[in-house]
Amino acid sequence: MKKIGLLTSGGDCPGLNACIRAVVRTANYYNIEVVAFKRGFKGLIENDFTTLDYKSVAGILQKGGTILLTAREPRFKDYNFRKIAYENIQKHNIEALFVIGGNGSFQGAYLLQKDFGLNIIGIPKTIDNDIYGTDYAIGFDTAVNNAMEAIDKIKDTTMSHERIFIVEVMGRDNGFIALEVGIAVGAELTLIPEYPFPLHVIEETILKAKEMGKNFAIIVLAEGVASAKELSEILNERLKDKDVGEIRYQVLGYIQRGGSPSAYDRVMASKFGVFAVEKFVQGEKNFMVAYENGKLLTKPLEISFNKVRIPNLEEYQINNILSM
């Protein structure tokens, strides 16, 4: 019987369990055994594994997080520890390692491919949706919905008390979540790192809203732009004589990464998992599953971390048109 390895690595996100389920059940369908390593690359180094089958993944489709657990493993940067990981993989007679991860995870997995010739198959996941080479990564849709639902509640209070609220969403290096959420909640202003706004433009936008008779405003801020706390303090000081009221802030944080995956994430995670295993069965090696122009395809793993994906300028323009 053929064997494949499976792990989840990096930050968790909704849809991981749906993908695990799809990989395992598709593998079992083709009479392939799945050896799953716990806590990502840490599990490879420590040979901490379990065998998954059709029954063991029952009832996990709708659950957030990952049943395999996940962790960041700095030791994996060291060749000697990667060699230990590879030797553990060899003990199980694994023909390919399936890695459900993001940019960093794929970069680590690629080192196993480069150092030892291991067949690596990547399945993209990250709420940031910033993996180059694919239009979609597992977890993004749920994260956007989580943020939208939270901001809708904040907006009720914002309108009732006639306030301005800066809401910080995840997106350390990119603004994909902020852009989608900004449109979904009708934000007066959306700030992302790719297209920075000068401080005076932010001030002018707030004052313009006031002139238009708006007594409330939602500003969606990607965390990579600035701290919501610091930005609110700066704006409160600079606008204290402008009669715009107190500017408050809220950091949404990890609420965006948790919870039951949306229908879209469940379906996409399932499709990604099935597609990855079927391509392995067909003999393809060393690839990343990608979703492009509505179709699933394979791409070289290294493309995911050699380039940077940035938001579509058209979507950014939509935000600007609809704001205010």
UniProtKB/Swiss-Prot annotation:
Q: Name one GO biological process term.
A: canonical glycolysis
Q: Report the PANTHER family cross-referenced here.
A: ATP-DEPENDENT 6-PHOSPHOFRUCTOKINASE, PHOSPHOFRUCTOKINASE
Q: What does the record give as the reaction this protein catalyses?
A: beta-D-fructose 6-phosphate + ATP = beta-D-fructose 1,6-bisphosphate + ADP + H(+)
Keyword Nucleotide-binding on this protein? yes
Q: Which organism is it from?
A: Sulfurihydrogenibium sp. (strain YO3AOP1)
Which intervals of the chain form a coiled coil?
none
Pathway(s) where this gene product acts: Carbohydrate degradation; glycolysis; D-glyceraldehyde 3-phosphate and glycerone phosphate from D-glucose: step 3/4
Gene3D superfamilies recorded: 3.40.50.450, Phosphofructokinase domain
**Sequence positions that bind ATP:** 11, 72-73, 102-105
Residues of the active site are: 128
> Which residues are listed for ADP binding in this entry?
21-25, 155, 186-188, 214-216
- InterPro entries, from UniProt? ATP_PFK, ATP_PFK_prok-type, PFKA_ATP_prok, Phosphofructokinase_dom, PKF_sf
Compartment(s) where it occurs, according to its Swiss-Prot or TrEMBL record: Cytoplasm
- Residues binding Mg(2+), per UniProt: 103
EC no. given is 2.7.1.11
Q: What is this protein called?
A: ATP-dependent 6-phosphofructokinase
The record's GO CC annotations read: 6-phosphofructokinase complex
